[in-house]
Amino acid sequence: MGSGCSSLSYSSSSTCNATVFSISSSPSSSSSLKLNPSSFLFQNPKTLRNQSPLRCGRSFKMESQKPIFDLEKLDDEFVQKLVYDALVWSSLHGLVVGDKSYQKSGNVPGVGLMHAPIALLPTAFPEAYWKQACNVTPLFNELIDRVSLDGKFLQDSLSRTKKVDVFTSRLLDIHSKMLERNKKEDIRLGLHRFDYMLDEETNSLLQIEMNTISCSFPGLSRLVSQLHQSLLRSYGDQIGIDSERVPINTSTIQFADALAKAWLEYSNPRAVVMVIVQPEERNMYDQHLLSSILREKHNIVVIRKTLAEVEKEGSVQEDETLIVGGQAVAVVYFRSGYTPNDHPSESEWNARLLIEESSAVKCPSIAYHLTGSKKIQQELAKPGVLERFLDNKEDIAKLRKCFAGLWSLDDSEIVKQAIEKPGLFVMKPQREGGGNNIYGDDVRENLLRLQKEGEEGNAAYILMQRIFPKVSNMFLVREGVYHKHQAISELGVYGAYLRSKDEVIVNEQSGYLMRTKIASSDEGGVAAGFGVLDSIYLI
């Protein structure tokens, strides 16, 4: 079992990081950041509006983080050379996405390629917080597994949400059928990502959410780290920073290793790994980077199918073997299926049920998927709930230290505070994929609307403490052009977990993803198209 940062390779001291990019340069209030890979990377930027001052009864001034180098000392000619070399490296090494202006770029490989939006140089991140995030990852992995086994907890916690959220209701129906059949998942695989921000007000590393399905960018995030290491080896002396402070990021390798071990546990050498994908996916190269490791390192056949194709081509045999297109499936790896848009018809829901009824290893199972929901995360933050699943008091304290404030809308006092000071809260629906959160005065308006409509609608949302990170000046590169912005970053730490009955085979921190957006944007309406990938520079 891996713990701490041991699963990443270091040279002396190292670092890992990632960033997000926008086209506006006006600094303003920041927000916690949940970015959909398919939206924030591939849509055209729009001009951002300055945000209104927070109506919090106090003046909040965002603090700028001390840069690891002085951008003003880098002349334009030097920066242009860095950008040129970065774009060449990206093109040669596959740090690319599909260009939305090309019609076939989402389903025909090699058509309409462009470099992924990137931070030109890595972002400073305190080493102590980096180690904290690494150290708790195996604990969160174990927590997810234990929660997933408590079917009553999942059903009870989400029972009210089921009444107001059709998507969650359909997932719960599948879960309920598995409980009725007493269906056991002897082999359980989770490829997770835990997202954090550094809160300037409390000087704490606070978790934004746990992601248990379709955790994107293990491939591209690894490449961004390698890109930054390459640039710093060439230009670090001139800039005044050391490439050895950027940690080696092995996210794709470790995810592929976990998938391969799950495939081995299934014990059918002729079976394949099936990746569930969207019909159009301009982030396909991130997915193919992982698939290529499975083929080349582990000699495993990988197939890609949409849920509609699984329903059309799939069946479950008497021994519960999943057959798709005439091939037995050992592992089902979801890179789709996390939003209602991924289930436009009954065909997709039939496929989800078919997969769940089979003996294939699911990544994630329906129980793991539900465990990652916003409501379950809010329930876990309640006093005494972690103790239901974990015994070690020190481990529980480590996890609780990462929790931001999370509340049900049944808490009338918190709702009152959020109406009075909406800038201190984020309102989150039961949705994955980004672009759904509610900020600022919209929090007040939605809470007042729900009060008029009655309490039933409350179950569709939770309230979270709004996190205010420090701001960094950064060069952000999109479509071959760099811009300087004040930006904020979000650290995602990957975790891999594999269990076969009573044996834990894998439980480790598995690399990282850094994303950044400009400080003036909220998520909703402006986050799409304003993100870049980045890496960490440990300080």
Curated annotation (Swiss-Prot):
Its cofactor is Mg(2+). It is found in: Plastid, Chloroplast. The gene is GSH2. It comes from Arabidopsis thaliana (Mouse-ear cress). ATP binds at residues 209, 374, 428-437, 439, 464-467, 490, 517, 523. GO terms for biological process: glutathione biosynthetic process; response to jasmonic acid. Binds 1 Mg(2+) ion per subunit. Belongs to the eukaryotic GSH synthase family. Homodimer. Its EC number is 6.3.2.3. It holds the Pfam family GSH_synth_ATP. It is an enzyme of class 6 (ligase). The lineage of its organism: Eukaryota, Viridiplantae, Streptophyta, Embryophyta, Tracheophyta. This is Glutathione synthetase, chloroplastic. Residues 1-61 form a transit peptide. InterPro entries: Glutathione_synthase (IPR005615), Glutathione_synthase_a-hlx (IPR014042), Glutathione_synthase_C_euk (IPR014709), Glutathione_synthase_N_euk (IPR014049), GSH-S_sub-bd_sf (IPR037013), GSH_synth_subst-bd (IPR004887), PreATP-grasp_dom_sf (IPR016185).
